[in-house]
Design a protein with these regions (language model features):
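Pre-Walker A adenine-sensing motif
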Residues: 1-11
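Short, acidic/polar N-cap/turn motifs at the starts of alpha helices
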Residues: 8-10, 47, 105
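Glycine-rich phosphate-binding P-loop
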Residues: 11, 15-36
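Short solvent-exposed loop/turn micro-motifs enriched in small/polar/acidic residues
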Residues: 2-4, 43, 85, 100-101
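Conserved nucleotide-sensing/catalytic segment adjacent to the nucleotide-binding pocket
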Residues: 37, 41-96
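Conserved NTP phosphate-binding and transfer environment spanning the P-loop NTPase/kinase superfamily
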Residues: 84-140
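Short acidic-glycine loop/turn motifs at beta-strand connectors
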Residues: 14-15, 51-56, 111
Length: 140
């Protein structure tokens, strides 16, 4: 299998894709909205196609009619800055809580390829920290 549609949202920051995983109601679209307000571009909301190309994982919107559209509860479907696709560099699982102050490096395997993974840290600054992570990487 070289592609799969996941129940996930995805944004891109300077070409770095963030796959936002988690169960329904876990805040995937809310996090995507916050990151877009901080300068990210929307790849897809709610459903994301992930394609493996060699050792790269590339995310895109599975329905071209939904590109650049995101649900904001209580407001409706909003237009957002968008990109057609992005190479994934990080995933966050909104359904799992990070309890460590300095967590170990984790990965999730998608289509046989490892992808760096972080868990939901449940603090007010984590969207800002994710933006830095995507722009500049993680040291420790």
């Amino acid at each position: 299998v070289t592609d799969e549609i996941l129940h996930a949202s995805c944004v891109a920051v300077e070409g770095q894709g963030l796959l936002i995983l988690g169960p329904a109601g876990s805040g995937k679209s809310s996090l995507a909205l916050r990151l877009i307000s901080l300068g990210a571009a929307l790849v897809s909301d709610d459903l994301t196609r992930v394609t493996r190309s060699g050792d790269r994982l590339v995310a895109s919107c599975p329905n071209p009619d939904l590109q650049g559209l995101i649900e904001a509860r209580g407001l409706g479907i909003l237009r957002a800055p968008k990109v057609e696709s992005a190479e994934l560099s990080l995933a966050i699982d909104m359904g799992q809580i990070e309890r460590e102050r300095l967590p170990t490096f984790r990965t999730v395997t998608i289509l046989g390829s490892p992808l760096s993974l972080v868990l939901h840290p449940q603090n007010d600054h984590f969207p800002d920290a994710l933006m830095l992570y995507l722009r500049h990487g993680r040291q420790a």
